[in-house]
Amino acid sequence: MTFAKTGFDKAEFKKNVISNCKTLYRKNFEEADKQQQFQAVAYAVKDIIIDKWIATQKEYAKQDAKTVYYMSMEFLMGRALGNNMINLTVYDEIKEVLDELGVDINVIEDQEPDAALGNGGLGRLAACFLDSLATLEYPAYGCGIRYKYGMFKQEIRDGYQVEVPDNWLKDGNPFEIKRSEYATVVKFGGYVRSYRDEKTGRDMFVQEDYRAVTAIPYDVPVVGYGVNTVNSLRIWDAEPVDTFNLSLFDKGDYQKAVEEENLAKNIVEVLYPNDNHYAGKELRLKQQYFFVSASVQRAVAQYKERHDDVRKLYEKVTFQLNDTHPTVAVAELMRILMDEEGLEWDEAW
């Protein structure tokens, strides 16, 4: 897939950086602190990406291209600003603009925290796959969790290592876009009630007495190197279906009033929670099912926006499972195809 390449306008970029600083912080660029300057630069780089991102999705839709959904518990993406400037092939030009503004590009890059979405080789492998897929211009989504703290960061206190939360989102992520229109409900627990459909004669299954959370996707651009293709890393945040129980709060049951909110928050707090106890094992399984269910539901819904026959899903959608964590996707896809789309077992399989 080939797109027409566009030039880089240094004067326009400089203007956008200065304007971003005023809009975001009510400050002139030279008056802003380093973190604020980073945000202003990052949003200006994002502006370059956006048109390519939109054009990529339009081209994929036009070609009705088969899409791969790469599911992984972690993505070790690194810092986005420098990587995006390099892949857009505008690093040197932006360095010149920042020199004119009196700031060192390396200092600006250092203001960005590492995205706490991955930890080791598994996450780095996933990130490399996404980079390669975008550079080779294959239609692809990365699918994972938008962890609030990731794992931890290390501090040395009195000569000892201390693990503290890595609050990487405290200043926001300038490259992500919240996609509330694609919010998806994920159900946990309860029981399955079966009944026979009088019209079709089929046995039907309904999940009841479950607890639900709302999965909210955030899209992060994955810029291909030297091309105009921009794919997406879609990471899911968890929010309660019912945010706040005012009735319980008014009765003084404050903990119960926010119980559903805490249930949702726990799912996305950290990568690989301690599973030396039952609660930790349960939380890990919830995390795995949470992002897998949301991703598969969205993939099927996106397919149905352009196609009527769900039996031909395999022609346009493929799922790549990174390690064992997302393998519950097999069972979840079968559930969706059978219980929601009405296929028989052999058809779904």
Question: Which residue ranges define each predicted feature?
Answer:
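A conserved ligand/cofactor-binding region detector
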Residues: 1-349
